[in-house]
Amino acid sequence: MFGIGLESYTVGSHDFYTAYCATRKQMFTLDTGHYEPTENVSDFVSTLLMYVPELMLHVSRPVRWDSDHVTIMNDQTLDLFKELVRADALNRAHVGLDYFDASINRIGAYLVGTRATQKCILQALLEPKAKLREYEDNGQNFERLALMEEAKSMPFGAVFDYFNLKNNVPVGEEYIAAIQQYEKDVTSKRN
């Protein structure tokens, strides 16, 4: 529960809401835009999933000077979805994205946030999870670390482009021109 019109203000405490949801088997909300910059929301996922049936993820960015709230592909968002995939918990997570930003085109904000989230989920799904678990189970820590490092440079971008191509969605930055055209043809004519 957040105060109306009061950004960065939370009524209650994280501990209270965690205990409330855990003792009543309720869905717990993690709002990625309301944590300290040194906290990584993904660190809470595996523990919470032991006690609550589902998670509601409000994926955004903290209040900053640059396009606040619009979801981007950053380490925090990628780590969040990697944690969900590694825990086999995508089916227990409900994802909502935040597109609030009065300084940029709303449709552009929507697409930037959606595409960034899709890229993070895809990169998490493409991680060689089975092999990493095998290394973990066998105590092969060097091999696990080496494979995790190699996975960072695997070409998920080509897979994302192919996915978009197969679904008749603009590939790469082609969507920018489509948004500009829509803005010219439609949104600029609104009062």
Specify the residue positions occupied by each region the protein language model found.
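Active-site-facing alpha/beta catalytic cores
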Residues: 1-10
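Histidine-acidic metal/acid-base catalytic patches
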Residues: 9-11, 18-30, 36-191
